[in-house]
């Protein structure tokens, strides 16, 4: 791998709440730390009280945005379709999406990890240009390991990464 390619894997990204974005950007200016938002809305304009668009994020120096986090999916009823809209909007505004995928404990115990993660990736990336795939980071988020005392192994993460690589 070239040094440029390997640098991507060493990038430090700090994703903070909206209220801390400008402060984080200002504080880390001139460092190797990149700033990301924890969420965004896919529409650029409209009556979406409390939502922040990709254009707004970009205007204050944000480079990355988390999309599809399990908490957003669970508590705010985000779907694979809304994740797809957010990815497209992020890319259109020059942001680099960090797309979360992962399975619940029930899905894991039923042996459905591959099916669930593959489906999430396929729906999230529907209509995304191949040239844009390199701008997207996929984060394996094993939902079953959050607050359960169970931990994902490096093999779990590697297997999910292989699913992404083969789908892409």
Where are these regions (language model features)?
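Glycine-enriched alpha-helix->loop->beta-strand junction motifs that scaffold or abut catalytic
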Residues: 28-35, 61-64, 96
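Short, charged, surface-exposed secondary-structure boundary motifs
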Residues: 43-49
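Expand to "…catalyze enediolate/carbanion chemistry for C-C bond making/breaking, isomerization
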Residues: 53, 58-62, 70-166
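A short aromatic-anchored loop/beta-hairpin motif
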Residues: 6-39
């Amino acid at each position: 791998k070239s040094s440029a390619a390997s640098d991507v894997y060493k990038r430090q990204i700090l994703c903070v709440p909206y209220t801390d974005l400008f402060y984080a950007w200002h504080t880390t200016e001139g460092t190797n730390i990149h700033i990301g938002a924890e969420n965004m809305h896919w529409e650029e304009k409209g009556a979406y009280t409390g939502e922040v668009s990709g254009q707004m994020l970009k205007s204050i120096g944000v480079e990355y945005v988390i999309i599809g986090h399990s908490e957003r999916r669970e508590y705010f009823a985000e779907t694979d379709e809304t994740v797809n809209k957010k990815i497209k909007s992020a890319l259109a505004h020059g942001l680099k999406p960090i797309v979360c995928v992962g399975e619940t404990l029930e899905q894991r115990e039923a042996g459905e990890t591959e099916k669930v993660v593959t489906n999430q990736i396929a729906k999230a990336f529907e209509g995304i240009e191949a040239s844009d795939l390199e701008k997207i980071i996929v984060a394996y988020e094993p939902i079953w390991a959050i607050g359960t005392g169970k931990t994902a192994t490096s093999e779990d993460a590697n297997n999910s990464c292989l699913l992404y690589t083969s789908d892409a």
